[in-house]
From Swiss-Prot:
The keyword NADP does not apply. Pfam families: Kinesin. GO terms for molecular function: ATP binding; microtubule binding; plus-end-directed microtubule motor activity. Residues 402-459 form a coiled coil. One of its GO terms (cellular component) is mitotic spindle. The lineage of its organism: Eukaryota, Viridiplantae, Streptophyta, Embryophyta, Tracheophyta. Responsible for microtubule translocation. May be important for the organization of phragmoplast-specific arrays of microtubules. Plays an essential role in stabilizing the mitotic spindle. Required during mitotic cytokinesis. It comes from Oryza sativa subsp. japonica (Rice). The keyword Heme does not apply. ATP binds at residues 98-105. This is Kinesin-like protein KIN-5C.
């Protein structure tokens, strides 16, 4: 309970923000403005650029004063209520916080001197918080016509050392140096606060004295010029005003009401690199920043409610301990600069000021003291001091150090002044008492005169008293009835408010349900849109795939027809080559047989001539028969030898031609077999490609059927879902009219279950569809890769077959050339042998002629005739042999040329077929790659999965009040409420008291 009361009494620290206008240097440099103040909305916006982006940070304070705000505006709106609270007996603190050069001292002090021309000593427009607060205090005290006393202190905190700015100037220089060496100590007062021992308290009686003291102390403050401020405060200052106001109670007792106002001007935090501080100034800036950093840590600890608050880390925080988290009302004036050059310090000031808003103080009114008690305490203090003085003089007491003795002497001096003041006040009070006694005597005389009149009115008073008692009883009864009615009305209002609150909760739950239904409908619409887009992607992919497959099928069919044509042309070429070879061989055979027959006829004719010559020569050459017989035998042997050689040559030629024919037939057979194998492979490849197309068509039909089936299933599912949702909505709407409380939750739950189940089924169907499409797509990719591999193998095999056929043809061509060369060599050998035989015959003839020249002179004519016939026969035979050899060589050359032409035609046909096969392979590869790319684009880029947007509501169970809870909100009947009120507040009739007959004392005049 006590902690709750403390929380109720706690008050947040009031934080004001003031932004100064641009200085002359900033105006000349055209510095950008980063601070925007909104006085009406109490907001401050800071514009900063981070990573090329402009970011605005907005801070909210209790009051905001822009660059155009005047000193009077700030004081009238924010400081006047604080000064009034000081006059009510509170301790209040006002301090300025911010960077150096932002106008803290100007805000707190301003222009301290009063205007000389004003009839009432009005302050100048630039006067700050301190002079305006002083003027308000004295104006208020003087207007109240009360006795008061005002004391002021003014201290400076420089480098963690406290200096009294109101120390008397007549102190000797040695004493002043000694005091400066020994700064004033800071001590605990035992009540959670601190006090400075030896601090001068100046008693002032009017505002002019305070202004003079303020000017004197401000002149002693340490200031210096920096790059940021021409007159920068190098220390913190604390100006305290303590007010004692005497009040009189109705009982005649006098009380002393005490209030204290602390006005703090903090030194500004500064960046040494920008302020240009060096050596001593840098040390000053370091101490200032250290104390302000400790102040920031204290603010952070108070805001975060840490167990330890570092008050003792700095004398500044020790002095402000009661103002931050204590029993004092605190107001912080944060001052900032609008320039971009001070953006970092401005953000730091705004952050600390914004955090300081969360500090909670527990202000308490200072306890009022009775004047007699205060005088008694002062007398006791005087007696104690006298005893100490006596002990010190008689040397029977405790000795203390010299500095403490001086401090106590100063304190005693102050106490003596206070006692003297109190004595003066006591004499004035005694004089006032005497005056009041005289007035009292005169009033007694006057009351004696009035007593006679009082006796006359007492009789009337008795009657009036009786009437008044009756009226009071009636009034009391009426007031009791009014209280009873008020109690009933309040209870009914409570019940009505509870019912309204419950209805609002139900309405918010219903609105939330409607929003969630809208989100679910939007999600279903997104799913339908995504499915439609995917269906269009699949349909377009199916159409493109069918068109590309048709193109590929047409290309392959054309290629197969071209290959069949090429194979037929090659087969025709082979057949024509074989036929030409057969024709040439038969012609050569005929020519050889004709040559042989001609040769045999010539030989027979020659033999006939020889036999005829022999028969004719028998009669004339009987004497040389032996020699002729020998010559004939030699000639017969020679002819037989020549005939054997000729038969042998003709046999060799026939054997060579037979071998050549068999080799040509074998070559033709092998070439046919090679082309047959190539044709079979082409047919296999064609059948494989046709099967591949059949598989593509089958996969496409499967995809089409599955897509149609999936679409139909989804459409049917959505129709079922729509019907079920409409039916359930109608039934739920009818039921909602009966019992709105319980069925709202059931309605929401059923809708969520129904929508969740349908969405799950749709999600499963979409995932199954995607898996099916992925499976068939992968199958199509496998089939395409297999077809590509088969086609590459086929192309490689066809190329190898072409190379083998070409090599085989070249080898057979070389073999035929070799055989023909051998045949030509054989013919040349036969001709040479024939010439050799002819020469041998001529030699034998010449020998025979030489031997038988004497014997055949008689038959010269006959021999010459026979020789001429033989020569003509020989010439004819030689001519026929030469013509036959030439014809045979010409036929062999023609056959060789025809074989070469046929081989070149076959090679060109095979090369053309190979080029078309390679072109077909490249075209098929490009079409296959295009199909794969299109499939990847269709199923990886265009085909999209459902992506959650985060807008689908999370499933949650609504809080449904029970019937008992709703019934408990119903207001009780009026009779029950009246009985309850009468039971808790029973009516007590007033006792019938008779009016007193004792004469009343006369009234004393309180104020004259």
């Amino acid at each position: 309970m006590s902690s709750r009361q403390d929380k109720e009494k706690s008050v947040n620290v009031q934080v004001l923000l003031r932004c100064r206008p641009f200085s002359d240097d900033e105006v000349r440099s055209n510095a950008p403005q980063v601070i925007t103040c909104n006085d009406y909305q109490r907001e401050v916006a800071v514009t900063q650029t981070i990573a090329g982006k402009q970011i605005d940070r907005v801070f909210t304070f209790d009051k905001v004063f822009g660059p155009t705000a005047k000193q009077r505006d700030l004081y009238d709106q924010a400081i006047i209520p604080i000064v009034n609270e000081v006059l009510e007996g509170f301790n209040c603190t006002i301090f300025a916080y911010g960077q150096t050069g932002t106008g803290k001292t100007y805000t707190m002090e301003g222009e301290c001197r009063r205007a000389k021309s004003g009839p009432k000593g009005q302050l100048p427009a630039d006067a700050g918080v301190i002079p305006r607060a002083v003027k308000q205090i004295f104006d208020t005290l003087e207007s109240q016509n009360t006795e008061y006393s005002v004391k002021v202190t003014f201290l400076e905190l420089y480098n963690e050392e406290i200096t009294d700015l109101l120390a008397p100037e007549e102190i000797s220089k040695a004493a002043l140096e000694e005091r400066q060496k020994k700064p004033l100590p800071l001590m605990e007062d035992g009540k959670g606060g601190v006090l400075v021992r030896g601090l001068e308290e100046e008693i002032v009686t009017n505002a002019s004295e305070i202004f003079s003291l303020l000017e004197r102390g401000s002149a002693k403050r340490r200031t210096a010029e920096t790059l940021l401020n021409k007159q920068s405060s190098r220390s913190h200052s604390l100006f305290s005003i303590t007010i004692h106001i005497k009040e009189a109670t109705p009982e005649g007792e006098e009380l002393i009401k005490c209030g204290k106002l602390n006005l703090v001007d903090l030194a500004g935090s500064e960046n040494i690199s920008r302020s240009g501080a060096r050596e001593g100034r840098a040390r000053e800036a370091g101490e200032i920043n250290k104390s302000l950093l400790t102040l920031g840590r204290v603010i952070t600890a108070l805001v975060e409610h840490l167990g330890h608050v570092p008050y003792r880390d700095s004398k500044l925080t020790r002095l402000l301990r009661d103002s931050l988290g204590g029993r004092t009302k605190t107001c912080i004036i944060a001052t900032v600069s609008p320039s971009v050059h001070c953006l970092e310090e401005t953000l730091s000031t705004l952050d600390y000021a914004h955090r300081a808003k969360s500090i909670k103080n527990r202000p308490e009114v200072n306890q009022k003291m009775m004047k007699s008690t205060l005088i008694k305490d002062l007398y006791g203090e005087i007696d104690r001091l006298k005893a100490e003085v006596y002990a010190a003089r008689e040397k029977v007491g405790v000795y203390i150090p010299k500095d403490r003795y001086q401090q106590e002497e100063n304190e005693r001096k102050a106490m003596a002044d206070q006692i003297e003041q109190m004595t003066t006040s006591l004499e004035a009070n005694q004089k006032q008492i005497n005056d009041l006694q005289e007035k009292y005597d005169s009033e007694l005389q006057h009351s004696a005169d009035l007593s006679k009149k009082l006796e006359a009115t007492e009789k009337c008073l008795d009657h009036t008293s009786n009437l008044l008692s009756t009226t009071k009883e009636d009034l009391k009864q009426a007031q009791y009835n009014l209280k009873e009615k008020d109690y009933i009305i309040s209870e009914q209002r409570k019940a009505e408010n509870a019912l309204i609150q419950q209805a609002c909760l139900l309405r918010s739950d219903l609105e939330k349900s409607n929003r969630e239904n809208a989100a679910l409908y939007s999600k279903i619409a997104r799913g339908d849109k995504l499915n439609a887009a995917n269906r269009s992607v699949v349909n377009s992919f199916q159409a493109d795939l069918a068109s590309k497959l048709d193109i590929l099928s047409t290309t392959l069919a054309t290629s197969i027809d071209q290959q069949n044509k090429h194979l037929k042309s090659v087969e025709n070429l082979c057949k024509s080559c074989v036929d030409s070879h057969d024709t040439a061989t038969s012609e050569i055979k005929k020519k050889i047989l004709a040559s042989k027959a001609l040769y045999m006829s010539h030989m027979e004719a020659f033999q006939n001539v020889v036999l005829l010559h022999k028969a004719n020569s028998n009669s004339t050459l009987e004497d040389i028969s032996s020699l002729s017989a020998a010559s004939c035998c030699s000639l017969d042997q020679l002819l037989a030898c020549v005939e054997g050689e000729a038969q042998k040559i003709f046999g060799d030629i026939q054997n060579l031609l037979a071998d050549h024919r068999s080799e040509v037939a074998h070559f033709t057979q092998e070439l046919r077999e090679s082309f047959r194998i190539s044709l079979d492979r082409t047919k296999d490849m064609s059948s494989f490609i046709l099967g591949l197309f059949d598989k593509y068509v089958e996969e496409t039909s499967k995809l089409q059927s599955h897509s149609n089936h999936t679409h139909e299933a989804q459409v049917k599912s959505l129709e079922d879902f729509q019907k079920a949702y409409e039916e359930q909505s109608k039934s739920e709407e009818q039921k909602l009219l009966a019992d709105i409380t319980s069925l709202v939750s059931k309605h929401v739950t059923r809708q969520r279950e129904l929508v969740g189940g349908r969405l799950n089924s749709l999600g499963d169907a979409a995932r199954g569809n995607k898996a099916f499409l992925d499976e068939h797509t992968s199958a199509m990719e496998v089939v395409t890769k297999d077809a590509k591999r088969k086609w590459e193998m086929f192309a490689e095999q066809a190329e190898n077959d072409c190379k083998v056929g070409s090599n085989f043809s070249a080898a057979k061509h070389c073999r035929m050339e070799t055989i023909l060369q051998e045949c030509a060599c054989t013919v040349d050998t036969a001709a040479q042998q024939w010439k050799a035989s002819h020469a041998t015959v001529n030699d034998l003839c010449r020998k025979q002629i030489a031997e038988v020249e004497a014997l055949v002179r008689s038959a010269i004519e006959t021999n010459e005739q026979h020789e001429a016939e033989i020569a003509s026969s020989r010439a004819t035979a030689e001519e026929h042999a030469s013509n036959s050899s030439k014809d045979l060589l010409q036929d062999v050359d023609n056959m060789l040329q025809e074989a070469r032409n046929s081989s070149s035609r076959v090679v060109s046909t095979v090369e053309a077929h190979l080029g078309e096969s390679q072109h077909l392979q490249e075209s098929h590869s490009s079409h296959t790659a295009g199909i794969n790319t299109h499939a990847d684009n269709a199923f990886q880029s265009s085909y999209k999965d459902y992506e959650p947007t985060g807008e689908t509501p999370v499933r949650s169970e609504p809080e449904v009040p029970s019937k008992d809870a709703i019934e408990s909100l119903r207001a009780m009947p009026m009779e029950s409420l009246m009985d309850e009120f009468r039971e808790n507040h029973p009516y007590e009739p007033s006792k019938d008291r008779r009016p007193s007959l004792i004469p009343r004392s006369p009234l004393a005049t309180i104020n004259n």
